[in-house]
Amino acid sequence: MQVVLLQDVVKLGKKGDIVNVSEGYARNFLYPKNLAAPATESKLKELKTQKQTQAAKKQKEEAEAKALAAKINGLTVALKVKVGDAGRLFGAISNKDIADGLKSQHGYSIDKKKIVLKEPIKNLGTYKITLKIHPVAQADINVEVASMD
């Protein structure tokens, strides 16, 4: 018996997959728990249209992310901070500070989780930072850390 999975089922398949199962397994386990539905013609058509819309949406998101990455790539964000005697910062510059600087100086709102810092910036200078905007798109920006003086 063929069924369409409505949710991910361990050792059976992922949501939207069409799988063959025994009638008893489908009737007694999958249907009562709303894990699957019978693979009827209407259900298969509905599934096909859902997959097409998801593919189109994914393609659109990838295109938007690549366009944003192209715009952001190579930008410079200048941050002015308080500095101690030895040229070390009071505190550190985190990915949130970089995201705020990118928004205030260039108008691009990037989630701080997408900014990749190996460790917080604690010294003056220019740093090359990677932004992972999307799994298929990333951009590099320069962060200039200068003294407030």
UniProtKB/Swiss-Prot annotation:
Cystine pairs: none
Short name of one Pfam family: Ribosomal_L9_N
PROSITE patterns in the cross-refs: RIBOSOMAL_L9
GO MF annotations, alphabetized: rRNA binding; structural constituent of ribosome
Keywords from the UniProt entry: Ribonucleoprotein, Ribosomal protein, RNA-binding, rRNA-binding
Keyword presence, Membrane: no
InterPro entries: Ribosomal_bL9 (IPR000244), Ribosomal_bL9/RNase_H1_N (IPR009027), Ribosomal_bL9_bac/chp (IPR020594), Ribosomal_bL9_C (IPR020069), Ribosomal_bL9_C_sf (IPR036791), Ribosomal_bL9_N (IPR020070), Ribosomal_bL9_N_sf (IPR036935)
GO cellular component: ribonucleoprotein complex; ribosome
GO process terms (BP): translation
Role played: Binds to the 23S rRNA.
Family: Belongs to the bacterial ribosomal protein bL9 family.
Name this polypeptide is given: Large ribosomal subunit protein bL9
